A protein has these predicted regions:
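Formylglycine-dependent sulfatase
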Residues: 2-476, 480, 485-515, 519-522
């Protein structure tokens, strides 16, 4: 296994690669052809395991001025959906298909956004979490640095370094990383100030500096691993939040909900879901346990804060390049807040390299305010994501709130639409499945778009279908639940018993979709 490069070596190699690319005939011709190209740049930013109410512009108390700034200049969506889990969401984002159709991370019989945009003359760049068996440079991206796997230690995803304790880890196996087409298993950074969120931000800025002055447009996908566990953050960021969560999760949920109502994100007629029945009341906790819980949420908040700082640095680079006006920025999360308990180092507090801790169900319940359930569930707490779009050239009125329904499968169609790129019927000699998503551009332009007749979800034992205002959802062996989402935004009043025919018809619709996906995946 090759030894991981130092940062200096990596930048030198990147410069050499850039020189070679500049001299390559096809790419040089592409740049000349793009000399008068006025298509938008596309900056796609994804958070990892972040709840609906965590950021400031969605009612949260966490400091996120840069993401909030995107909302002030653009549109916040209140009914946009992901796939409830990391890899399925990423497969749908990249392909515009349901993950069940394309073998999830394999993305078979599908073309990626990067492949389509690259063929249309875009420079395609990525950093961060890939979470698929292949590598980004094999699926249309010109450049890549990041975690090809699902999660890792933020301070050191590899082997123990001299003078340091062993890095906290979830499993014994090493996590895959990659620099361009070179894989590292493990990847052990030599820089002891390495921190994944900062490393991804730095790489994005470096690539913008390298390619941002080209005449043609760029597509940059930044897939942060924050605030996915383990809970790791810089001490100075943690200090900003230490003690603020001694108010407890009950008071936090109430405060967030009240801010959301005041912001107009949710109507007061929709009561927030009650505290998860498996979560104790904060006031019932022994005093000696409260400080530890406060620390967990402080570290989680610090991770989001640091991500927002990085987003601000990337946006500053876009402005420096003079490309802010015609850059479409999309920000979202891959699923809801995570209730998993993966506390591998119970004797090491969250934050430093040697720890491996999770935020756990009580705080995840608060992160997903006002909704029920969590990551991996197809109730709103698992699938409804903050979704922010900024595009100054097109979105003239900032601070908008849209209640039109969107889905992660719509991002591919949106990118094709704004880029003027044709979605192919075949790619590389292989037939490509028809696109499932629909463009969100009409919403950006102040119009009401023709949405989907039905939207579907399935992860593990959880499943759901939404048709208009009706949503049918179930988990495990539990019976289907039916909700009127116009009257009951937080899924508190199950109507399955009083509308059995509607529930049965929607269940059949879901079963037919699932069978179609199985056939398509089997043939891929």
């Amino acid at each position: 296994m090759p030894k991981p490069q130092t940062r200096r070596q990596f930048l030198q190699a990147a410069a050499g690669a850039a020189l070679g690319a500049a001299l390559a005939g096809p790419l040089a011709r592409r740049a000349r052809a793009a000399a008068k190209d006025d298509r938008p740049n596309i900056l796609l930013i994804m958070a990892d395991d972040m709840g609906f109410s965590d950021i400031g512009c969605y009612g949260g108390e966490i400091r996120t001025p840069n993401v909030d700034g995107l909302a002030r200049r653009g549109i916040r969506f209140t009914r946009c959906y992901n796939n409830a889990k990391c890899a399925p969401t990423r497969a749908s984002l990249l392909t515009g298909m349901y993950s069940q159709q394309v073998g999830e991370g394999r993305m078979s019989k599908a073309v990626t956004i990067a492949e389509v945009l690259k063929a249309a003359g875009y420079r395609t760049l990525m950093t961060g979490k890939w979470h698929a068996p292949s590598l980004p440079v094999h699926r249309g991206f010109d450049r890549y640095f990041g975690l090809a796997d699902g999660c890792c230690n933020f301070w050191n995803p590899g082997k123990q370094r001299p003078g340091e304790p062993p890095p906290g880890r979830k499993w014994a196996r090493w996590r895959r990383w990659a620099i361009e087409d070179k894989e590292f298993t493990p990847y052990t950074p030599e820089d002891k100030n390495f921190y994944t969120t900062d490393a991804f931000t730095d790489y994005a800025i470096e690539r913008l500096g390298e390619y941002g002055k080209e005449a043609g447009p760029f597509f940059l996908y930044v897939a942060y691993t924050a605030p996915h566990y383990p809970l790791h953050a810089w001490p100075e960021d943690i200090a900003r939040y230490r003690g603020k969560y001694r108010m407890g999760w009950d008071a936090l949920r109430k405060a967030r909900y009240e801010r959301m109502v005041k912001m107009g994100l949710i109507a007061k007629r929709y009561p927030a879901s009650p505290r998860d029945p498996s979560v104790p009341a904060w006031n019932d906790l022994p005093e000696e346990k409260r400080d530890g819980w406060d620390l967990k949420m402080a570290v989680y908040a610090a991770m989001i804060d640091r991500m927002d700082q990085g987003i601000g640095r990337i946006l500053a680079k876009v402005r420096e390049l003079g490309r802010e006006e015609n850059t479409l920025v999309i920000f979202l999360s891959d699923n809801g807040g995570c209730a998993e308990n993966v506390n591998k180092t119970p004797d090491v507090p969250p934050g430093p390299l040697a720890s491996y801790r999770t935020v756990d169900k009580p705080w995840a319940n608060a992160s997903n305010t006002p909704f029920r359930k969590y990551k991996s569930w197809d109730h709103e707490g698992g699938i409804c994501t903050p979704f922010i779009v900024s595009w100054p050239r097109v979105i003239k009125k900032g601070g908008q709130i849209s209640r039109q329904v969107g889905h992660i499968i719509d991002i591919m169609a949106t990118c094709c639409d704004v880029a003027g790129a044709a979605y192919p019927s075949e790619y590389g000699g292989t037939k490509v499945l028809p696109l499932e998503g629909k463009s969100l551009r009409p919403i950006f332009e102040g119009k009401t778009r023709t949405g989907h007749d039905a939207l579907f979800w399935q992860f593990g034992k959880s499943k759901a279908v939404r048709c208009g205002k009706w949503k049918l959802v179930a988990n495990g062996s539990r019976p289907w639940e039916l909700y009127d989402m116009e009257a009951d935004r937080c899924e508190l009043n199950d109507l399955a018993a009083s509308h059995p025919d509607r529930a049965a018809a929607m269940a059949k619709l879901w079963n037919d979709w699932a069978e179609r996906c199985r056939r398509q995946a089997k043939s891929s």
